[in-house]
From Swiss-Prot:
Residue ranges occupied by any Helicase C-terminal domain in the UniProt entry: 430-622
GO cellular component: nucleolus
EC category name: hydrolase
CDD domains: DEADc_DDX31, SF2_C_DEAD
Domain writeup: The Q motif is unique to and characteristic of the DEAD box family of RNA helicases and controls ATP binding and hydrolysis.
InterPro entries reported for this sequence: DEAD/DEAH_box_helicase_dom, Helicase_ATP-bd, Helicase_C-like, P-loop_NTPase, RNA_helicase_DEAD_Q_motif, SPB4-like_CTE
Keywords assigned: ATP-binding, Helicase, Hydrolase, Nucleotide-binding, Nucleus, Ribosome biogenesis, RNA-binding, rRNA processing
Official protein name in the record: ATP-dependent RNA helicase DBP7
Positions of short motif Q motif: 155-184
Catalytic reaction annotation: ATP + H2O = ADP + phosphate + H(+)
Binding residue positions for ATP: A201, Q202, T203, G204, S205, G206, K207, T208
Start-end of Low complexity biased regions: 55-68
Enzyme Commission designation: 3.6.4.13
Amino acid sequence: MAEDGMLLNFSLDDSVIKPQQRFKGGTWKDRLVAKKIAVKRQNKSRHSAETGAVNSNNPQNPNKINVPTGQRPAKRQRIDGGDFKPTTKSSAGGGGVGNDEQTDRKSYGDRQVISSLFTYNPTAKTVASTDGATHDEDTTEPAKPSNAPLVDGIDTFTSLGLSPSLATHLLTKLNLKTPTAIQKSSITQLLKEECDAFVQAQTGSGKTLAYLLPIVERLMRISSHNKGKKDSEGNTVHRDSGLFAIVLAPTRELCKQISVVLDGLLRCAHWIVAGTVIGGEKKKSEKARLRKGLNILVATPGRLADHLENTKVLDVSNVRWLVLDEGDRLMDLGFEEEIQGIIKKLDERRRPSKIPDLPAKRTTILCSATLKMNVQRLGEISLKEAIHIKADPADEDDEQKDGSKQPEFSAPAQLKQSYAVVAAKLRLVTLTALLKRTFARKGSVMKAIIFVSCADSVDFHFEVFTRRESSEELPDADDENAPSSSNVHGSIATASAFSNPSNNVILHKLHGSLPQHVRTATLSAFAKQKDASVLICTDVAARGLDLPNVDFVIEYDPAFCSDDHLHRIGRTARLGRDGRALIFLLPGNEEGYVDILKGSYREGSSNSVTRNEVNEILKRGFGGNSEAISKGWEDKATDWQLDIERWALEDSTILEMARRAYQSHIRAYATHIAAERHMFNIKDLHLGHLAKSFALRDRPAKINVPGLRPGNEDTKKSFKADRKLASGEKRKMSAREDSSSTTDAAEARKKMQQKLKEHMAGASEFNIA
């Protein structure tokens, strides 16, 4: 047949005989995902073949354009290498908030992000007034002081009922000529009647002397009446006569200050002995002082409750005066249970005294600047049929007539308050510029206090402001402006960031995490400092402390409640002196805090709260007075910020300190009271911009601190890696994880060796020191 010699030649494509790819191993979900990816890749290559597109990776690509080397397009600036100054918002094409948000959402891995100080900052909601003055301009008439001593010359300490010897001592030794309004009301009432009292007055009005003078006067009278009696009868007042008065204060610093004031008063009555028992001190030394005998005891509630429970030599049977100073702070710190126990033990151990003229009942005095619910609760616990003592009794009558409720606590009338709306990225440079301008001239400002929210922030800013550049020379040993010898504690140093050749500024730091002897030495050094000095601290220094010559208070972080704000600014403008206070606020909801600032003055007062412009502060701090000098203030501020960031990157200790300060600041920001949380909402914080103010270049998710939980991103990565490890795949560890695991292993090995040494030592098992 003709068909027998026919030969058919079929041309088959390679894809027909290509073996199918099969996926093995892993979970069914992983195999399904891999299969979908392979199918998608095949469909894409088939579509490219049909449309005639050529792969760009092919060296024979006809669509390839060769660009000459001299006309290469401009490359984007690198993010991870070197410092650069980004273009400003006005010069960047198409820049806006939307672009900024997209940039922030980009993943740069472990690379550093260097952002500009003056771009993409939120604008303030409120409009600044055209007649606003800066903090160093005196444009308003000084108000009449509301907490100054009386100047009419009629009321003197002698006319209030004090003995001539005590009044003369106040005049000659303490330089106190006339009493304040609260001292006049309190001394007269407490000497006239033996009843409980609630003393309420402005901060800085002399409440300490208002309750100490009546107690010292009564003890001096009892001593003079029994002067001819023999000591063996126990009727003469001396250190062995017993404990007559107890003063409770919330903080150790306030106890130390009350003790200093009391020692100054008792120089005219040396036979009356006072002492202190506070936390942080050696209990053995305190027991020795109690064993020798004390007549007046200043204590913190926790330590006094401990001594009442465990110290048998502490005899409180003759206690006739109990003072609760800063009652609102005592309740805020949670001392209600201790105070209840102290009052209960005083009632149980009270005995009739053999000393004539000693009151038969105990008088309790509660002192507080505010009349909040917790203070009323403390009054219910400690006071019985108490009288209310105010600086001006007419205020209470006017309030009853008008039916209007005045603020519970008002700022001194002569205090000038101001605020500055500062973007988060500009906080650090603005504070530096403000301090540079404040201490530009010697003698303009003697002392200033900076309040921050947490102890880690205090440590970080102290290191920033006291860092010494390589070009700077160390101060001479005989230099009068050099830091004192207490600098061995690391809490006092020269503020190189805002000092100048004509005005050397000494910086002090104070917070509750420091050892007690360091806190005491630092506070004493700041109080005795005669040159320009700055104290950066937490709220541990916001209550009751009378620090002399404080002219300026800066609230770098707003207080957690309005009452704490009033106590902070009360460190200045004391006893009729002038003072200024400035608070930093973020743009947005925090600007509503200005209404609280305005409401801190008494109704009808002519005082106003002024606004300081950020650009003006930066221009005056990094520029100068003249227009020609102050042109490059933006570049100077940027250079200073970048220098701080490089310094933090080079020193791992400083970098960890900055990260801890950043984390602690965010945690502290979330603790504002509920009534003010709409102004201080943590969800409104721009964490990336806030990290810039702590000299950090890491993204917020990458700012990890040892001992804290990892961020969401790291948690997800570790979860996925563990899941792959469970499925049989080999986990690839990053450099960070490798280093951390190595560190953990080294620490574990070190702890194991330490435990072995302890077990090898025979006496360690019975070491009870």
